[in-house]
Amino acid sequence: GCNAIYREFMPHVLVATDRLIANKIQEEGIDKKIKFWTRRPIQGSKALKIERPYYGNSSGPVALSRACIDGATHVFLLGFDFGSTDDKFNNVYADTEFYKKSTDKPTFAGNWIYQINEIAKAFPRVTFFRVKDQSFSDVDFTNNNIVNIMMDEFKLKINKL
């Protein structure tokens, strides 16, 4: 999982690349309970340092790369909407600590798309499933191993794995 998802439930692995939320995660001791990856671990923490070539990537792409490095053959991208339908910041954690306001402009998604394409290219035997709904923007991925599926199809697939 990425960033503030630990507020909802404790994932097995967590990634945060933005320093403020990464520091908060370490200060709360989350890095001692689960595997936590960040760019700059606080000295004395159990956080793991993101290595190159993924060091400069955003949290979502780093999480994808970690899943691949750890041997996943199917990676499901949940919450990767890559855009906004109303020109506003669309994040489930908008208006909370470390996040923009829901009325702010959306974050540019081009970097995420580029980073995910590069990861998919580096791991051609992994199938990436972008789970979307009707409101998600279409994205033209350059790799054949990135597939768009709807939420209903995801539920069927995940229950078979």
Kindly give the residue locations of the regions a language model identified.
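Metal-ion/cofactor- or nucleotide/acyl-coenzyme-handling active-site neighborhoods
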Residues: 1-161
